[in-house]
A protein has these predicted regions:
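Phosphate/pyrophosphate-binding loops at sites that engage ATP/ADP/AMP, CoA/4′-phosphopantetheine
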Residues: 1-4
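Metal-dependent phosphodiesterase/phospholipase catalytic core, i.e.
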Residues: 6-8
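Beta/alpha (TIM)-barrel catalytic core signal, keyed to glycine-rich beta->alpha loops juxtaposed to Asp/Glu
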Residues: 11-200
Length: 201
């Protein structure tokens, strides 16, 4: 990278490493100026609470950012988002399009070049192909049709503008997918946002 520091270092706690040791490494990077800000990626609730508390009292680097999955089909952490926001901690919504499921591309078929068609990647999408997730995707598709916007645009707008969310992370696999994502500019009318929030609960 040809730099002496990174703006944000997201550390991901590993089960085989004590959390205290992980936070000590992050704190060293923060206090030495090698990381301007420190955050946690995909940590458990207890790890998150411990890290934020230690940072708040100065025992370790302050946690300024957290990354975890958050989307219309995975909104179980909504109360955590609100709590973090009240403490000044930003949230990166990972898997904001649920592995592509929230684009609507799996509604009627499984494209041959998709994650769901791959034996190695199917596990990333499978939870979103039936049951509750499918009903949320259908509701999102109906809302998108009414707004004359792509389904993924509406799903991403809901996450992007959710109170407490700092940014939404998506993982395009191709240049075409990236171009499509860059065209997503929807702003949801309040009634649509409220209905989608109810559906996501």
């Amino acid at each position: 990278l040809d730099t002496d520091y990174v703006d944000v270092w997201l550390v991901e706690p590993r089960p085989e490493v004590p959390l205290e040791e992980t936070l000590e490494a992050a704190t060293l990077a923060y206090r030495s100026g090698r990381a301007r800000y420190v955050g946690l990626s995909r940590s458990s609730h207890w790890q998150l609470a411990e890290a934020v508390t230690r940072g708040a009292v100065g025992v370790s680097a302050p946690i300024t950012l957290v990354e975890f999955p958050f989307s219309l089909v995975d909104a179980a952490c909504a109360s955590t988002v609100a709590e973090l926001a009240s403490r000044g901690v930003g949230v990166l919504a990972a898997s904001a399009l649920a592995g592509g499921a929230l684009t609507g591309k799996y509604r009627h078929t499984t494209p041959a070049d998709s994650r769901a068609a791959s034996p190695h990647l199917r596990h990333m999408v499978e939870p979103y192909l039936s049951g509750f997730a499918r009903s949320v995707i259908e509701a999102t598709h109906r809302a998108a049709s009414g707004l004359d916007r792509p389904t993924g645009d509406v799903a991403l707008a809901w996450v992007r503008d959710y109170p407490g969310i700092s940014s939404a992370l998506v993982g395009p696999r191709t240049a075409r997918q990236l171009d499509t994502l860059l065209e997503y500019t929807a702003t949801l009318p309040a009634p649509i946002r409220e209905v989608l929030s109810e559906v996501a609960q």
